[in-house]
């Protein structure tokens, strides 16, 4: 909606004077503004339709127990996974699905699906460490915490009888993150080097995603140990390079290494946004870094695009893995919301266009095949990103 503005007397006089002056021959006819407005509204309607189709897909593919994703249609690239790996992925994907339904759903059927997802998050056992080297359980904690942190402040849950259980489960998830925080101060999803308790291997992007979830939890009134959060923020800050890229691994010395490595800007596109959002929201970076980070994202976007749907992780240029595509776009939408209002629309439009180009006929979005989790987490990431960009353009 375009806000109506009341003109001051002086402005009204100037406006009247301007109307009396003959129109410049080189200027477009005044009527040309109407098609431009109509075109903008039409594009926004297209985005809204894409969101609705994505939400309908999530609703149609939700499991009977309210969860999203399942170990069906397994491919060779997940031959390592065990039952507990799938339990962790299910919990994380259900958290994302719940957020998508809560933020993007518009119908009574969406409300029913959201209630089922919340029940699924409450009734499922808390995922435990998968094995000595597989710590995919961390993803369950990250998106479980964020889901409850986003749901609890909503009016529809203010008097919900499940509210105490939701807060209790969120507290459990926060405690689990604290238990599995590495000596570097962050988190990852494997521990291939030391296989210790707590794990040692740490990634910048898992840590940044966890930080954002914890900041959301604080905002929702949940208790978060400031020492844990500060260590995690310092960990993400340590991984940030002068180029604006974030190293994949967190190590003693952060370095971009060789010119075609994953820690160059072109290999870091899916990590830059989540890292910047975490550090800006956590108060360790000035918000002025957000715009250059988004400019890098779109300037080099082809390196994310060419990696999408490749079946082997990191087989693409700059070792980009396919699963960074929708992850990166989701956090890019959060980065856009950190920009000054008058700078958001151009980036929002670009992000919308990139996502609209890849939506499947059934409404799903996907980037990397992981059983039935692929389209569930991908669609949740995409509709959440599109919804945020609509907010950004509406505010503009």
Task: Go through each PLM region and give its residues.
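Boundary of Sec targeting at the N-terminus
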Residues: 21-23
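C-terminal closing repeat unit and adjoining cap/tail of repeat-based domains
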Residues: 346-360
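Active-site neighborhood of glycoside hydrolase catalytic domains
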Residues: 235
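N-terminal secretory signal peptides that target proteins for export/translocation
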Residues: 1-3
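Active-site-surrounding "flap" and adjacent substrate/cofactor-binding loops of secreted or lumenal enzymes
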Residues: 111, 118-121
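Bacterial N-terminal signal peptides
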Residues: 8-18
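An alpha-helical repeat/solenoid feature that recognizes helix-turn-helix modules
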Residues: 25-56, 60, 64-113, 127-175, ...
């Amino acid at each position: 909606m375009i806000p109506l503005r009341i003109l001051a007397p002086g402005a009204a006089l100037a406006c009247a004077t301007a109307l009396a002056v003959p129109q410049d021959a080189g200027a477009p006819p005044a009527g040309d503004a109407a098609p431009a407005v109509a075109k903008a509204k039409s594009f926004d309607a297209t985005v809204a339709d894409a969101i609705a189709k994505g939400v309908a897909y999530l609703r149609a593919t939700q499991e009977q127990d309210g969860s999203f994703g399942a170990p069906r249609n397994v491919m060779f690239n997940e031959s390592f996974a065990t039952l507990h790996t799938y339990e962790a992925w299910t919990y994380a994907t259900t958290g994302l699905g719940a957020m998508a339904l809560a933020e993007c759903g518009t119908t009574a059927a969406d409300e029913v699906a959201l209630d089922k997802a919340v029940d699924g998050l409450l009734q499922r056992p808390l995922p435990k460490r998968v094995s000595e080297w597989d710590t995919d359980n961390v993803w369950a904690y990250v998106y479980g915490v964020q889901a409850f942190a986003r749901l609890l402040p909503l009016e529809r849950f203010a008097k919900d009888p499940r509210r105490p259980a939701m807060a209790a489960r969120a507290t459990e998830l926060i405690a689990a993150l604290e238990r599995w925080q590495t000596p570097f101060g962050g988190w990852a999803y494997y521990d291939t080097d030391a296989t210790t308790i707590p794990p040692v291997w740490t990634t910048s992007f898992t840590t940044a995603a966890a930080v954002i979830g914890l900041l959301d939890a604080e905002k929702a009134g949940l208790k978060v140990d400031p020492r844990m959060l500060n260590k995690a923020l310092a960990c993400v800050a340590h991984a940030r390079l002068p180029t604006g890229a974030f190293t994949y691994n967190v190590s003693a010395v952060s370095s971009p290494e060789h010119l075609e490595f994953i820690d160059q800007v072109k290999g870091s596109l899916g990590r830059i946004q989540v890292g910047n959002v975490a550090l800006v929201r956590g108060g360790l970076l000035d918000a002025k870094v957000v715009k250059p980070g988004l400019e890098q994202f779109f300037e080099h976007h082809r390196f994310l695009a060419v990696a999408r749907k490749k079946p082997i992780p990191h087989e693409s240029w700059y070792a980009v893995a396919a699963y960074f595509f929708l992850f990166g776009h989701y956090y890019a939408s959060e980065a856009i919301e950190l920009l000054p209002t008058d700078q958001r629309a151009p980036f929002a439009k670009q992000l919308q266009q990139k996502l609209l180009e890849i939506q499947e006929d059934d409404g799903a979005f996907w980037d990397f095949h992981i059983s039935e989790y692929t389209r569930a987490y991908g669609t949740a990431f995409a509709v959440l990103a599109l919804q945020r960009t609509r907010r950004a353009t509406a505010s503009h």
